[in-house]
Amino acid sequence: MSEYITLSLDEVCALSYQVLTRHGLSDAHARAIAEVITQGQRDECHSHGVYRLLGCVRSVREGRIDPRAEPSLRHVSPGVLEVDAHYGYSLLGFHTGLPILAEKARSQGIAAMVIKRCFHFSALWPEVEAIADYGLVGMAMNPSHSWVAPAGGRQPVFGTNPLAFAWPRPGGQPFVFDFATSAIARGDIELHARQGKPIPEHWAIDADGQPTTDAKAALQGAMQTFGGHKGSALAAMIELLAGALIGDLTSAESMAFDGGVGATPCHGELVLAFDPRVFLGEGYEQGLERAEGLFAAIARQGARLPSQRRFAARARSLEHGVQIPRGLLEDIRGLL
């Protein structure tokens, strides 16, 4: 018997939607979450694919999340939009505010969308790719729970604090990156623990502050930042921009708000959009050519552009479907 089961992308999306609605999420929330989970599985980002359904359901069961919350919008200024998720999942808030964010960026050249009081678990690249689909440059960032120790420290202060960026490219996939400022995403350590696999020593320290290859010990200790003090500084910046600046929780406050329940982190998110046409005016085409020259200079050395591996996985999945570990799929189907 194979350890993996192949599903089509339509089957992944339908299963995700069924699980989510079975546990009380509204149609709008379930569709938004099922879409991004399918995108994660499609692009072989396994820590943000169907595995996340387990956490979604657990968080709803704990009663922290309003599964039927409807986002509300407030125009703070011509260039700033606030989306109040009312303690629902963030994705519906993002999709609700995205068209208005794009309008503001086209009017002002640069615009910000602040999503507040939201529960967030998903990758950010689907969001910045959606901004790039408008022909805009996108950035997104958010804190999480305080799982990550600062460089030189032993106690968790930061979240995994991802940062994502997308640059639209005419006639091709956008230039996209999305990475945690921790050495690895939290979900990757969770998957290693689930599968009984060791982790690289630089990912985390145990509860005694010692480097560890034991994924379960890492989950009880603290994760490390990537790049030492540089990753630590970026993590602090995201705490400030997507926490203090927007009037929402830092990662430490999100952890305190959770109260030991272990639900999806609750915090805010900062999303930025830039319109190249406003910035460049008559030099728009020349600006895009400069960007393409940069990408060509990278690629002709044999270096890989960010997300190329993910785009290749996307093409495979669209043709052949995706493989899901049998045990994980059984756990998910057990939620129905």
Swiss-Prot record:
Residues the record lists as binding substrate: R52, T160, R186, G187
UniProt-annotated catalytic positions: S47, H48, D188
Main function: Catalyzes the reduction of Delta(1)-pyrroline-2-carboxylate (Pyr2C) to L-proline, using NADPH as the electron donor. May be involved in a degradation pathway that converts trans-3-hydroxy-L-proline (t3LHyp) to L-proline.
Assembly and oligomerization: Homodimer.
Family membership: Belongs to the LDH2/MDH2 oxidoreductase family.
Protein name: Delta(1)-pyrroline-2-carboxylate reductase
InterPro entries per record: Mal/L-sulf/L-lact_DH-like_ah, Mal/L-sulf/L-lact_DH-like_NADP, Mal/L-sulfo/L-lacto_DH-like_sf, Malate/L-lactate_DH-like
Catalytic reactions on record: L-proline + NAD(+) = 1-pyrroline-2-carboxylate + NADH + H(+); L-proline + NADP(+) = 1-pyrroline-2-carboxylate + NADPH + H(+)
Record key words, sorted: NADP, Oxidoreductase
Keyword Calcium: no
Binding sites annotated in the UniProt record for NADP(+): 120-124, 178-180, 229-230, 304-310
GO-annotated molecular function: oxidoreductase activity
Enzyme Commission number(s) from the entry: 1.5.1.49
One Pfam family hit: Ldh_2
